[in-house]
Amino acid sequence: REVFPSLNKLTILSDYKKMSQKRLGLVRTKIEQRIDFDPESLLIGKSNKVKKRKLKPKEFQIFINQDLQRIKNIALKKQIVQYILIHELLHIENEDLITLSKNYNRRKKKKIHINNFEEEVFNRFNRLRKLKGIMQIEKREHLDIAIQKILELINWHKK
C-alpha cells in the first residue's frame, strides 16, 4: 500500500491459480456498463443520443501462477510474487483493464507494455525493497535475468 497510495480505497484480493506457463500473473475485474439516455425523447423521436458509460470497478482479483509455489526458498518466492503483484497493481493504477474492454481501434492506440511501464514496475519494486530494508537492484536487466534463472530452477519452460 505504501508503493501504491492511489489504490487504498479499492478492494484487491490475490490468490494462486492454475494457468498456462506463458503467464506469471493476471488481474481480473467486472466492468459495469451503464447506458444513459432519455427514454421519452428516444421513443417520440426527438433525440437519438445514447451514451454508454463504463464505471470504474472497486474490486479487483490478482491471480499468481500456482506453479510458482514450487520455489522452495520462501524469500525468493516472496520477491518474485511481489514483483508480479507490483506489475498487476500498476495495470490497475493505469486503468488498463477499462481500456482493454473498449473496441479494438481504441485499444491498439494505447500500448500497454511500453518501455516506461516496465521501468515503472522496476522502480516501484525497488521502492518496496528500500522500505523493507533490502538492498536495491541497480539495473532492470539484472532483475529480469535473476527471475529467469529462478524460473529455470523449477523447470518453468519444461513442463
Which residue stretches match the model-derived regions?
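Active-site-proximal or metal-binding-adjacent scaffold patches in catalytic folds
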Residues: R1-Y83, I92-K159
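Walker B catalytic acidic pair
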Residues: E88
